[in-house]
C-alpha cells in the first residue's frame, strides 16, 4: 500500500473525524501526553501576550492542551482536514482561539497572522511528504527566540519499541479501524510510524532546519521509547 499524502490523507481524516475523538479517548495517556508536550514549550506568564500556532490541530485535543499550558495565549489551530476542523470548531472555546483550514504546504493565511511566539506540532511531521520543507516554514514563522514543540512517534531502529507499537496496533487500532470503516487511514498511520525517523534522526533534522537548543524528551508509561517531545528554538 502506498502512503497517503496531501488530499488523499485529508480525505481519509475527513471520514475518520466522526469517531476520532472516541478512539483517542480510549487510548491510555493520549490527552495527558499532549498536555505534557505543550507544557514543555515553557511559555511564560501563562501565555499572556503570546501567539501560538497549533499546526495539525485535528479535532482540537492538542489545542486544548495548549490552553491548559498557556490559558492567556492567542492560539491558532491549523489543519488540512475540513472534517477534523469541523469537530474542533463545534467545541466550546474562548475568543482567543481560532481555526484555519489549510494544508501545511500552503499557509498564506497562517503566515499573514504571524510571526509566532511558539509552534506546537503533534502527530504531524511523519504525515507530510516533505518534513524538511515544513520545518523550514515553521522556522520562518517563528519570532527569533520562538519555541517549537513536536509531539511525535519516533521509534525506528529500536526493535523492542517497534514490538510495542505493533502490539498496540494489532490489539486495538486495527480492530477499531475495521469496525469504523477507516482501515486505509490506519494502515497508513501504522506504516508512517514504522518508517519515520528515529529520535536521533529527527533531532538532527531539526538542527538542519536551523533550530537550536534541540532536546528530545520521553513520554511516560507504555509510550516510553515510542513517543517523544522534541523541543527547540529559533535562534
Per-range role (PLM):
Residues 24, 154-207, 218:
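C-terminal alpha-helical "lid/dimerization" subdomain adjacent to the S-adenosyl-L-methionine
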Residues 51-107:
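Class I SAM-dependent methyltransferase SAM/SAH-binding core
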Residues 105-119:
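A short acidic, Gly/Pro-enriched loop at the edge of an enzyme's catalytic core
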Residues 118-131:
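A short SAM/SAH-binding and catalytic strip from SAM-dependent methyltransferases
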Residues 146-153:
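Conserved beta-strand signature within the Rossmann-like core of class I S-adenosyl-L-methionine
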Amino acid at each position: 500500500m502506498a502512503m497517503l499524502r496531501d488530499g488523499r490523507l485529508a480525505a481519509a481524516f475527513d471520514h475518520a473525524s466522526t469517531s476520532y475523538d472516541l478512539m483517542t479517548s480510549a487510548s491510555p495517556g493520549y490527552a495527558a501526553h499532549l498536555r505534557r508536550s505543550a507544557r514543555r514549550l515553557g511559555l511564560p506568564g501563562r501565555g499572556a501576550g503570546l501567539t501560538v500556532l497549533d499546526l495539525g490541530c485535528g479535532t482540537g485535543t492538542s489545542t486544548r492542551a495548549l490552553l491548559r499550558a498557556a490559558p492567556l495565549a492567542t492560539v491558532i489551530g491549523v489543519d488540512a482536514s475540513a472534517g477534523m476542523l469541523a469537530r474542533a470548531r463545534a467545541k466550546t472555546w474562548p475568543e482567543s482561539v481560532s481555526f484555519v483550514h489549510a494544508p501545511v504546504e500552503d499557509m498564506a493565511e497562517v503566515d499573514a497572522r504571524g510571526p509566532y511566539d511558539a509552534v506546537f506540532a503533534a502527530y504531524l511531521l511523519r504525515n507530510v511528504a516533505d518534513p524538511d520543507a515544513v520545518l523550514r516554514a515553521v522556522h520562518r514563522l517563528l519570532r527569533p527566540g520562538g519555541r517549537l514543540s513536536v509531539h511525535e512517534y519516533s521509534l525506528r531502529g529500536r526493535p523492542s519499541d517497534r514490538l510495542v507499537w505493533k502490539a498496540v496496533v494489532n490489539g486495538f487500532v486495527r480492530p477499531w479501524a475495521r469496525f469504523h470503516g477507516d482501515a486505509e487511514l490506519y494502515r497508513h498511520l501504522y506504516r508512517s510510524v514504522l518508517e519515520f525517523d528515529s529520535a536521533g534522526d529527527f533531532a538532527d533534522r531539526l538542527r538542519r532546519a536551523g533550530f537550536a537548543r534541540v532536546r528530545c524528551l520521553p513520554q511516560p508509561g507504555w509510550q516510553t521509547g515510542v513517543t517523544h517531545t522534541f523541543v527547540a528554538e529559533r535562534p
